[in-house]
């Protein structure tokens, strides 16, 4: 057995070591396609490195809108955007209190309203209240507003306690570019207008 102090250790010169490292790098490159920036063109890779959020946004954003009721209008339900978590994204616009559909496709449309009222005094006449909320579609295919989603309720206010009722509905619809989505509400004076209680929106699926 060769004594430990006489073990033969091959020497690798600097040039040979560089060649080995270069070969190893070339072998590993095909498996690096999943790394950020690899497999992209130089300009695309540079953009992804400098603006990663922008690169992701361009590939994932879809048309979407979320509107809230204007609390300053007590006798009408006016929708507003770009405030208190309300927004218009990727082509949606708000015109004449209606959402304009930017592109044809399948959209999930939704809306919610909350109504409240005070108790009646014993001397007052307690007549029932009719509450309703409806999402309507106006399209070039129809000469009138077509109901898409609707809820109705008769409320009989009590003598002792205030009352509170909510309505929510949502469903998917095939819509066409240029379609108009709007709402119609009965019982507007009883609406609880806040960003979390009265809202209306749609987003592409």
UniProtKB/Swiss-Prot annotation:
One GO BP: humoral immune response
Cellular component GO terms, alphabetical: extracellular space; plasma membrane
Leader sequence residues: 1-34
Effect of residue 125 to P: In allele 8.1
Keyword field: Cytokine, Glycoprotein, Membrane, Secreted, Signal
Residues linked to a glycan: 41, 96
GO molecular function, one term: tumor necrosis factor receptor binding
Residue span(s) of domain THD: 63-205
SUPFAM superfamilies: TNF-like
InterPro entries documented for this protein: TNF, TNF_beta, TNF_CS, TNF_dom, Tumour_necrosis_fac-like_dom
Main localization of the protein described in the UniProt heading: secreted
Subcellular location: Secreted; Membrane
Highest rank taxon of the organism: Eukaryota
Pfam family, any one: TNF
Subunit and partners: Homotrimer, and heterotrimer of either two LTB and one LTA subunits or (less prevalent) two LTA and one LTB subunits. Interacts with TNFRSF14.
PANTHER family in the cross-refs: LYMPHOTOXIN-ALPHA, TUMOR NECROSIS FACTOR FAMILY MEMBER
Disease: Psoriatic arthritis: An inflammatory, seronegative arthritis associated with psoriasis. It is a heterogeneous disorder ranging from a mild, non-destructive disease to a severe, progressive, erosive arthropathy.
Family according to the record: Belongs to the tumor necrosis factor family.
Its job: Cytokine that in its homotrimeric form binds to TNFRSF1A/TNFR1, TNFRSF1B/TNFBR and TNFRSF14/HVEM. In its heterotrimeric form with LTB binds to TNFRSF3/LTBR. Lymphotoxin is produced by lymphocytes and is cytotoxic for a wide range of tumor cells in vitro and in vivo.
Protein name per its UniProtKB record: Lymphotoxin-alpha
Organism: Homo sapiens (Human)
């Amino acid at each position: 057995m060769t004594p430990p102090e006489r073990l033969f250790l091959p020497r690798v010169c600097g040039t040979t070591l560089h060649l080995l490292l270069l070969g190893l790098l070339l072998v590993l490159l095909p498996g690096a396609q999943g790394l950020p920036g690899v497999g992209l063109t130089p300009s695309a890779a540079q953009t992804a490195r400098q603006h990663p959020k922008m690169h992701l946004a361009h590939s994932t954003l879809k048309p979407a809108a979320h509107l809230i009721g204007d609390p300053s209008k007590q006798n009408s339900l006016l929708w507003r955007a770009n405030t208190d978590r309300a927004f218009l994204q990727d082509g949606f616009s708000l015109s004449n209190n209606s959402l304009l559909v930017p592109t044809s496709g399948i959209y999930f449309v939704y809306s919610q309203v909350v109504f409240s009222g005070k108790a009646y005094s014993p001397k007052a006449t307690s007549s029932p209240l009719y509450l309703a909320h409806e999402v309507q579609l106006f399209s070039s295919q129809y000469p009138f507003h077509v109901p898409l989603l609707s809820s109705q309720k008769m409320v009989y206010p009590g003598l002792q306690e205030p009352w509170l009722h909510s309505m929510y509905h949502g469903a998917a619809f095939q819509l066409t570019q240029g379609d108009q989505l709007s709402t119609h509400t009965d019982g507007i004076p009883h609406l609880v207008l806040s960003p979390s209680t009265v809202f209306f929106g749609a987003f592409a699926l």
